[in-house]
Amino acid sequence: MSDINATRLPGMEPPSPMPCVGDADNFTLTRG
């Protein structure tokens, strides 16, 4: 899921502080 986060939010830091939140947001946006 690192690639998704990096592609979605390149400006934000890597998924360390809140990987779940980032993943969820990306999943929701990607899935719809």
From Swiss-Prot:
Covalent link Cyclopeptide (Gly-Pro), residues: G11-P19
InterPro entries per UniProt: Amanitin/phalloidin
Residue ranges of the propeptide: 1-10, 20-32
Processing and modification events after translation: Processed by the macrocyclase-peptidase enzyme POPB to yield a toxic cyclic nonapeptide. POPB first removes 10 residues from the N-terminus. Conformational trapping of the remaining peptide forces the enzyme to release this intermediate rather than proceed to macrocyclization. The enzyme rebinds the remaining peptide in a different conformation and catalyzes macrocyclization of the N-terminal 9 residues.
Record region (Disordered): 1-32
Keywords: Toxin
Superkingdom as given in the UniProt entry: Eukaryota
GO molecular function per UniProt: toxin activity
The protein's role, per its UniProt record: Probable toxin that belongs to the MSDIN-like toxin family responsible for a large number of food poisoning cases and deaths.
Family that this chain belongs to: Belongs to the MSDIN fungal toxin family.
Name recorded for this polypeptide: MSDIN-like toxin proprotein 11
Gene that encodes the chain: MSD11
